[in-house]
Regions:
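N-terminal export leaders
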Residues: 11-37, 113, 134
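N-terminal secretory signal peptides
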Residues: 1-11
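Post-signal-peptide N-terminal segment of Sec-exported extracytoplasmic proteins
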Residues: 66-72
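Residues marking the start of alpha-helices
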Residues: 7, 44, 106-108
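C-terminal segment of N-terminal export signals and the immediately downstream linker at the start
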Residues: 10-14, 30-64
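Mature-region segments of soluble proteins
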Residues: 2, 55-58, 72-175
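Short amphipathic alpha-helical segments enriched in leucine
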Residues: 21, 60-64, 98
Length: 175
């Protein structure tokens, strides 16, 4: 009796899962989706384009730079601009920002590799209403996130816990 063996294998579970993930990711990216560089967070946009949202996130990071604060928190801070009310102001502002970057020889603001060069571009338009709106709203949008407080060592408000007098008022050790 002769045994016939073949090396033909069907698709493995691993290959099936990899294929499904790739298809799912390509569908999501095509539908107003912004993902962080670490891919640990993602955001869906409705009224602004993913490119505009990515530019806003980079702009926020350049205005208030903190190396220990993840992009996710900057994304949350600018998420409010993804609305019908801000749509035209964001589009016009990003176009002006990209035009300023193109004047420096770059394709867009997002393609400027060095923070110092991006800051110069921002300084050139710091008197614009677009810049002032973004900068002003970032103060509360970024720093009012309780998750960010812990990154800066801020324990939050103390009124509900009896105030600061008996709770950490004298615990500083750097004086």
């Amino acid at each position: 009796m002769e045994t016939i063996t073949t090396n033909a294998r069907g698709i493995s579970r691993r290959d099936l899962l990899k294929g499904c993930v790739m298809v799912g990711a390509s569908l999501a990216v095509g539908s107003g989706f912004v993902a962080g560089s670490s891919a640990a967070w993602a955001m869906e946009t409705i009224h602004v384009t993913p490119s505009e949202m990515a530019t806003l996130i980079q702009m926020a990071r350049d205005i208030y730079p903190h190396n220990h604060v993840a992009d996710e928190y900057y994304a949350r801070a600018v998420k409010g601009y993804d609305s019908e009310d801000f749509k035209s102001q964001i589009a016009e502002g990003i176009n002006a920002l990209n035009a300023a970057a193109q004047g420096q020889g770059y394709a867009s603001y997002l393609t400027v590799p060095w923070e110092a060069d991006r800051v110069k571009i921002l300084q050139s338009m710091e008197d614009s209403s677009f810049f002032q709106t973004i900068r002003g709203n970032l103060i509360t949008g970024l720093y009012n996130q309780p998750e960010v407080w812990t990154l800066f060592g801020y324990e939050g408000e103390s009124y509900s816990k009896g105030g600061y007098i008996n709770r950490g008022f004298n615990d500083i050790n750097w004086i």
